[in-house]
């Protein structure tokens, strides 16, 4: 079974909680052991990225990506893929395509 650890950075870690639950529901259906949690973007500097495979950016904080990426690089976490969550999937709480995007980024090791 494929394993993945995801953190979703969002504005206040409230709406992304719905996404987290959707991802947790979908993961076993596609054979993925998934640990996923959300964190408020204001705390991105305090988060422990040591056990994260993919960082996902919620649509409402996309503008902070230009601050988050340099921070990750200076802390040595620039090899962790950072993925923008599709706005439509986020708004409709479609966990499966969000999870698939995270898996693809982890496998390819890319930052979009």
Q: Language-model features: where?
A:
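Non-catalytic signal-transmission and effector/linker regions of two-component phosphorelay proteins
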Residues: 1-2, 110
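Conserved active-site segments centered on acidic
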Residues: 3-43
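Gly/Ser/Thr-rich loops at beta-strand to alpha-helix junctions
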Residues: 11-17, 61-63, 90-91
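Residues at alpha-helix caps and immediate loop-helix transition turns in enzyme cores, especially N-
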Residues: 19, 67-68, 94-95
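Short, well-ordered alpha-helices that flank and scaffold nucleotide-derived cofactor binding pockets
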Residues: 21, 25, 29, 70, ...
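Structural motif
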Residues: 43-49, 92-95
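Mid-chain, well-packed structural core segment of small domains
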Residues: 48-88
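Ser/Thr/Gly-rich flexible loops in soluble cytosolic domains mediating phosphotransfer, phosphorylation
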Residues: 77-112
């Amino acid at each position: 079974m494929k394993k993945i650890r995801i953190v979703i950075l969002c504005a206040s870690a409230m709406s992304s909680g719905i996404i987290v639950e959707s991802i947790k529901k979908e993961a076993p259906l596609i054979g993925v052991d998934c640990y996923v949690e959300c964190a408020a973007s204001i705390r991105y500097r305090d988060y422990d990225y040591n056990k994260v495979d993919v960082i996902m950016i919620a649509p409402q904080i996309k503008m902070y990506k230009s601050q988050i990426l340099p921070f990750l690089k200076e802390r040595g976490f620039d090899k962790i893929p950072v993925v923008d969550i599709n706005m439509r999937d986020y708004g409709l709480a479609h966990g499966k395509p969000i999870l698939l995007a995270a898996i693809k980024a982890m496998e390819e090791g890319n930052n979009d």
